[in-house]
Amino acid sequence: MKTGFIGLGSMGLPMAQRLQAQGHDLTLYARRPESLEPFAGTSVAIAATPAEMGALVDAVGICVFDAAGVEEVMFGPDGLAGTLNPGAVVLVHSTVAPAQIRKIAGRAATHGLRVLDAPVSGGQPRALTGELTIMIGGDADTLADVTELLSALSNHVVHLGAVGAGSYAKLVNNTMFSAQIALADDAMKAGESLGVDPAGLAAVLATSSSACVASGVRLRAHSLAGLADSPANLTLTKDVTLMAEILGDAPGSGLVEVAQRFVAAMRSS
Protein backbone atom coordinates (compact mmCIF):
# COMPACT_ATOMS: atom_id res chain seq x y z
CA MET A 1 0.00 0.00 0.00
CA LYS A 2 1.40 3.38 -1.01
CA THR A 3 1.22 5.58 2.06
CA GLY A 4 1.41 9.30 2.70
CA PHE A 5 2.10 11.06 5.99
CA ILE A 6 1.57 14.71 6.91
CA GLY A 7 2.66 16.29 10.18
CA LEU A 8 6.22 15.70 11.35
CA GLY A 9 6.03 17.08 14.87
CA SER A 10 6.92 15.43 18.16
CA MET A 11 4.72 12.39 17.43
CA GLY A 12 4.40 12.50 13.66
CA LEU A 13 8.15 12.38 13.04
CA PRO A 14 8.82 9.12 14.92
CA MET A 15 5.68 7.60 13.41
CA ALA A 16 6.90 8.42 9.90
CA GLN A 17 10.36 7.14 10.78
CA ARG A 18 8.82 3.88 11.95
CA LEU A 19 6.88 3.48 8.70
CA GLN A 20 10.04 4.12 6.71
CA ALA A 21 12.05 1.67 8.83
CA GLN A 22 9.39 -1.01 8.27
CA GLY A 23 9.79 -0.69 4.52
CA HIS A 24 6.54 1.07 3.64
CA ASP A 25 6.31 2.89 0.31
CA LEU A 26 6.18 6.33 1.93
CA THR A 27 5.56 9.87 0.68
CA LEU A 28 5.85 12.84 3.05
CA TYR A 29 4.69 16.43 3.04
CA ALA A 30 5.78 19.12 5.50
CA ARG A 31 5.28 22.88 5.52
CA ARG A 32 8.77 23.39 6.95
CA PRO A 33 11.60 21.92 4.85
CA GLU A 34 13.73 21.34 7.95
CA SER A 35 11.16 18.82 9.17
CA LEU A 36 12.16 16.58 6.28
CA GLU A 37 15.89 16.58 7.04
CA PRO A 38 15.81 13.24 8.95
CA PHE A 39 14.74 11.57 5.69
CA ALA A 40 17.51 12.98 3.50
CA GLY A 41 19.21 10.24 1.53
CA THR A 42 16.44 7.69 2.15
CA SER A 43 13.96 6.13 -0.25
CA VAL A 44 11.15 8.32 1.10
CA ALA A 45 9.45 10.49 -1.54
CA ILE A 46 8.73 14.14 -0.79
CA ALA A 47 5.60 15.88 -2.08
CA ALA A 48 5.54 19.63 -2.69
CA THR A 49 1.87 19.87 -1.66
CA PRO A 50 -0.78 17.64 -0.11
CA ALA A 51 -2.45 17.51 -3.53
CA GLU A 52 0.72 16.15 -5.10
CA MET A 53 0.83 13.51 -2.37
CA GLY A 54 -2.81 12.58 -2.89
CA ALA A 55 -2.16 11.58 -6.48
CA LEU A 56 0.51 9.11 -5.33
CA VAL A 57 -0.94 7.23 -2.35
CA ASP A 58 -3.68 4.82 -1.28
CA ALA A 59 -3.78 5.89 2.36
CA VAL A 60 -2.55 8.90 4.28
CA GLY A 61 -1.92 9.57 7.96
CA ILE A 62 -2.42 13.10 9.26
CA CYS A 63 -0.78 14.14 12.53
CA VAL A 64 -1.15 17.92 12.70
CA PHE A 65 -2.03 19.97 15.79
CA ASP A 66 -5.78 20.52 15.49
CA ALA A 67 -8.94 20.25 13.39
CA ALA A 68 -8.15 23.44 11.48
CA GLY A 69 -4.87 21.90 10.39
CA VAL A 70 -6.61 18.70 9.28
CA GLU A 71 -9.15 20.68 7.27
CA GLU A 72 -6.39 22.72 5.65
CA VAL A 73 -4.42 19.72 4.36
CA MET A 74 -7.62 17.94 3.35
CA PHE A 75 -9.73 20.65 1.76
CA GLY A 76 -7.60 23.77 1.46
CA PRO A 77 -5.85 24.97 -1.69
CA ASP A 78 -3.74 22.08 -2.95
CA GLY A 79 -5.52 19.78 -0.47
CA LEU A 80 -5.64 16.00 -0.50
CA ALA A 81 -9.34 15.69 -1.25
CA GLY A 82 -8.98 16.87 -4.81
CA THR A 83 -6.45 14.23 -5.84
CA LEU A 84 -6.88 11.13 -3.65
CA ASN A 85 -8.56 8.31 -5.52
CA PRO A 86 -12.08 7.33 -4.40
CA GLY A 87 -11.80 4.66 -1.73
CA ALA A 88 -8.54 6.01 -0.32
CA VAL A 89 -8.28 5.92 3.48
CA VAL A 90 -7.46 8.97 5.58
CA LEU A 91 -6.20 8.24 9.10
CA VAL A 92 -6.55 11.28 11.34
CA HIS A 93 -4.04 10.83 14.16
CA SER A 94 -4.61 14.37 15.44
CA THR A 95 -6.72 14.74 18.57
CA VAL A 96 -9.81 16.76 17.64
CA ALA A 97 -13.34 17.11 18.95
CA PRO A 98 -15.57 14.20 17.90
CA ALA A 99 -18.01 16.57 16.20
CA GLN A 100 -15.14 18.01 14.19
CA ILE A 101 -13.87 14.64 13.00
CA ARG A 102 -17.40 13.60 12.04
CA LYS A 103 -17.74 16.79 9.99
CA ILE A 104 -14.40 16.13 8.30
CA ALA A 105 -15.39 12.52 7.56
CA GLY A 106 -18.71 13.61 6.10
CA ARG A 107 -17.08 16.14 3.83
CA ALA A 108 -14.43 13.63 2.77
CA ALA A 109 -17.16 11.13 1.89
CA THR A 110 -18.46 13.52 -0.77
CA HIS A 111 -15.09 12.97 -2.48
CA GLY A 112 -15.40 9.19 -2.11
CA LEU A 113 -12.83 9.09 0.69
CA ARG A 114 -12.94 6.97 3.85
CA VAL A 115 -11.89 8.51 7.17
CA LEU A 116 -10.89 6.85 10.43
CA ASP A 117 -10.18 8.89 13.51
CA ALA A 118 -7.03 7.25 14.82
CA PRO A 119 -5.48 9.22 17.68
CA VAL A 120 -2.42 7.69 19.27
CA SER A 121 -0.85 7.40 22.70
CA GLY A 122 2.49 6.15 23.94
CA GLY A 123 5.07 8.84 23.27
CA GLN A 124 8.04 9.07 20.96
CA PRO A 125 10.00 5.99 22.13
CA ARG A 126 7.01 3.70 21.58
CA ALA A 127 6.32 5.29 18.20
CA LEU A 128 9.81 4.34 17.08
CA THR A 129 9.36 0.73 18.21
CA GLY A 130 5.82 0.30 16.86
CA GLU A 131 4.23 0.00 20.30
CA LEU A 132 1.72 2.84 20.25
CA THR A 133 -1.88 2.45 21.30
CA ILE A 134 -4.16 3.58 18.45
CA MET A 135 -7.80 4.40 19.19
CA ILE A 136 -9.99 3.86 16.14
CA GLY A 137 -13.34 5.33 15.30
CA GLY A 138 -14.89 4.36 11.98
CA ASP A 139 -16.03 1.58 9.69
CA ALA A 140 -14.73 -1.92 10.47
CA ASP A 141 -14.16 -2.76 6.80
CA THR A 142 -12.10 0.40 6.36
CA LEU A 143 -10.06 -0.54 9.40
CA ALA A 144 -9.45 -4.01 7.95
CA ASP A 145 -8.03 -2.43 4.80
CA VAL A 146 -5.32 -0.59 6.77
CA THR A 147 -4.60 -3.18 9.47
CA GLU A 148 -1.20 -4.04 8.02
CA LEU A 149 -0.26 -0.36 7.88
CA LEU A 150 -1.35 0.24 11.47
CA SER A 151 0.49 -2.85 12.69
CA ALA A 152 3.76 -1.13 11.80
CA LEU A 153 2.92 1.58 14.33
CA SER A 154 0.97 -0.22 17.00
CA ASN A 155 0.71 -3.46 18.93
CA HIS A 156 -2.58 -2.30 20.43
CA VAL A 157 -5.18 -1.09 17.92
CA VAL A 158 -8.56 -0.66 19.62
CA HIS A 159 -11.72 -0.23 17.52
CA LEU A 160 -14.13 1.77 19.67
CA GLY A 161 -17.06 2.35 17.32
CA ALA A 162 -18.14 4.90 14.73
CA VAL A 163 -16.15 7.93 13.62
CA GLY A 164 -15.60 10.11 16.68
CA ALA A 165 -15.31 7.26 19.18
CA GLY A 166 -11.53 7.21 18.96
CA SER A 167 -11.41 10.93 19.66
CA TYR A 168 -13.64 10.53 22.71
CA ALA A 169 -11.28 7.89 24.09
CA LYS A 170 -8.20 10.04 23.46
CA LEU A 171 -9.77 13.04 25.20
CA VAL A 172 -10.62 10.90 28.22
CA ASN A 173 -7.06 9.55 28.29
CA ASN A 174 -5.38 12.94 28.03
CA THR A 175 -7.71 14.47 30.61
CA MET A 176 -6.92 11.63 33.00
CA PHE A 177 -3.20 12.07 32.30
CA SER A 178 -3.43 15.78 33.15
CA ALA A 179 -5.43 15.04 36.30
CA GLN A 180 -2.84 12.51 37.44
CA ILE A 181 -0.09 15.11 37.07
CA ALA A 182 -2.14 17.52 39.19
CA LEU A 183 -2.78 14.85 41.82
CA ALA A 184 0.92 13.99 42.00
CA ASP A 185 1.60 17.67 42.63
CA ASP A 186 -1.03 17.66 45.39
CA ALA A 187 0.63 14.60 46.92
CA MET A 188 3.99 16.35 47.06
CA LYS A 189 2.38 19.42 48.62
CA ALA A 190 0.64 17.22 51.19
CA GLY A 191 3.98 15.66 52.06
CA GLU A 192 5.53 19.10 52.43
CA SER A 193 2.73 20.14 54.79
CA LEU A 194 3.44 17.06 56.90
CA GLY A 195 7.18 17.65 56.94
CA VAL A 196 8.09 14.61 54.82
CA ASP A 197 11.43 14.78 53.02
CA PRO A 198 10.56 15.72 49.38
CA ALA A 199 13.22 13.56 47.74
CA GLY A 200 12.30 10.59 49.86
CA LEU A 201 8.58 11.01 49.22
CA ALA A 202 9.19 11.31 45.48
CA ALA A 203 11.16 8.06 45.59
CA VAL A 204 8.30 6.36 47.43
CA LEU A 205 5.61 7.64 45.06
CA ALA A 206 7.66 6.65 42.01
CA THR A 207 7.97 3.03 43.13
CA SER A 208 4.79 2.34 45.09
CA SER A 209 1.19 1.46 44.27
CA SER A 210 0.29 5.02 43.22
CA ALA A 211 3.00 5.15 40.55
CA CYS A 212 1.95 5.82 36.95
CA VAL A 213 3.37 7.46 33.84
CA ALA A 214 1.76 10.83 34.57
CA SER A 215 2.83 11.00 38.21
CA GLY A 216 6.36 10.20 37.08
CA VAL A 217 6.25 13.23 34.78
CA ARG A 218 5.50 15.52 37.74
CA LEU A 219 7.96 13.84 40.12
CA ARG A 220 10.86 14.11 37.67
CA ALA A 221 10.11 17.80 37.11
CA HIS A 222 10.17 18.57 40.87
CA SER A 223 7.29 21.08 40.41
CA LEU A 224 4.49 21.94 38.00
CA ALA A 225 6.49 25.00 36.96
CA GLY A 226 9.20 22.62 35.79
CA LEU A 227 6.79 21.32 33.14
CA ALA A 228 5.97 24.72 31.67
CA ASP A 229 8.32 24.42 28.69
CA SER A 230 7.17 20.95 27.63
CA PRO A 231 5.70 20.91 24.10
CA ALA A 232 3.08 18.46 25.39
CA ASN A 233 1.47 21.23 27.42
CA LEU A 234 -0.18 22.83 24.40
CA THR A 235 -1.73 19.51 23.43
CA LEU A 236 -2.89 18.68 26.96
CA THR A 237 -4.34 22.16 27.46
CA LYS A 238 -6.22 21.87 24.16
CA ASP A 239 -7.57 18.43 24.97
CA VAL A 240 -8.67 19.21 28.54
CA THR A 241 -10.44 22.32 27.24
CA LEU A 242 -12.22 20.25 24.57
CA MET A 243 -13.20 17.65 27.16
CA ALA A 244 -14.65 20.34 29.43
CA GLU A 245 -16.76 21.71 26.57
CA ILE A 246 -18.03 18.28 25.54
CA LEU A 247 -18.69 16.76 28.95
CA GLY A 248 -20.15 19.78 30.72
CA ASP A 249 -21.52 18.76 34.12
CA ALA A 250 -22.26 15.15 33.15
CA PRO A 251 -21.05 12.30 35.38
CA GLY A 252 -17.27 12.20 35.23
CA SER A 253 -16.87 15.97 35.16
CA GLY A 254 -14.90 15.78 38.41
CA LEU A 255 -12.04 14.37 36.35
CA VAL A 256 -12.03 17.53 34.25
CA GLU A 257 -12.02 19.73 37.35
CA VAL A 258 -8.84 18.08 38.59
CA ALA A 259 -7.21 18.23 35.15
CA GLN A 260 -8.02 21.93 34.88
CA ARG A 261 -5.75 22.57 37.87
CA PHE A 262 -2.86 21.36 35.73
CA VAL A 263 -4.03 23.52 32.82
CA ALA A 264 -4.33 26.59 35.06
CA ALA A 265 -0.81 26.04 36.39
CA MET A 266 0.59 25.83 32.87
CA ARG A 267 -1.19 29.00 31.77
CA SER A 268 0.17 30.93 34.74
CA SER A 269 3.75 29.73 34.28
Annotate each language-model stretch with its function.
Residues 1-62, 193:
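NAD(P)+-binding Rossmann beta1-loop-alpha1 motif at the extreme N-terminus of oxidoreductases
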Residues 3, 73, 95-172:
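Rossmann-fold dinucleotide-binding core
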Residues 26, 46, 114-116, 157, ...:
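Hydrophobic beta-strand scaffold residues
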Residues 32, 66, 139:
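Residues in the short beta-alpha loop(s) of Rossmann-like NAD(P)-binding domains
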Residues 50-113:
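Rossmann-fold NAD(P) dinucleotide-binding segment
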Residues 165-251, 255-269:
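Helical "substrate-binding/catalytic lid" subdomain
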